[in-house]
């Protein structure tokens, strides 16, 4: 079983809203997930406090046990939008 940290799409047509989830890679994009880590709203400006919220401690846990982040989640981490540094 390959576990991925990825975005699951919600919201209305042309008004996307994403949940950051941990899911088995074989499950559909918006299907069953193991754990909800946070959310991402691309319709808001980056400075808005609700633009991207993630439970950092749980993200660190899943990365430590081998979960693979998708390209977009990796991009968030590299850009510093999700901090994985020790607090």
UniProtKB/Swiss-Prot annotation:
GO terms for cellular component: cytoplasm; small ribosomal subunit. Keywords: Ribonucleoprotein, Ribosomal protein. InterPro entries: Ribosomal_bS16, Ribosomal_bS16_CS, Ribosomal_bS16_dom_sf. GO terms for molecular function: structural constituent of ribosome. SUPFAM superfamilies: Ribosomal protein S16 (SSF54565). It comes from the Bacteria. Belongs to the bacterial ribosomal protein bS16 family. This is Small ribosomal subunit protein bS16. It comes from Ehrlichia ruminantium (strain Welgevonden). The lineage of its organism: Bacteria, Pseudomonadati, Pseudomonadota, Alphaproteobacteria, Rickettsiales.
């Amino acid at each position: 079983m390959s576990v991925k940290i990825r975005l699951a799409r919600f919201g209305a047509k042309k008004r996307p809203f994403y949940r950051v989830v941990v899911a088995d890679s074989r499950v559909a994009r918006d299907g069953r997930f193991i754990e909800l880590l946070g959310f991402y709203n691309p319709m808001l400006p980056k400075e808005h406090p609700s633009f991207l919220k993630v439970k950092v401690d749980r993200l660190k846990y899943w990365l430590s046990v081998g979960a693979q982040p998708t390209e977009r989640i990796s991009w968030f981490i590299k850009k510093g939008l999700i901090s994985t540094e020790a607090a």
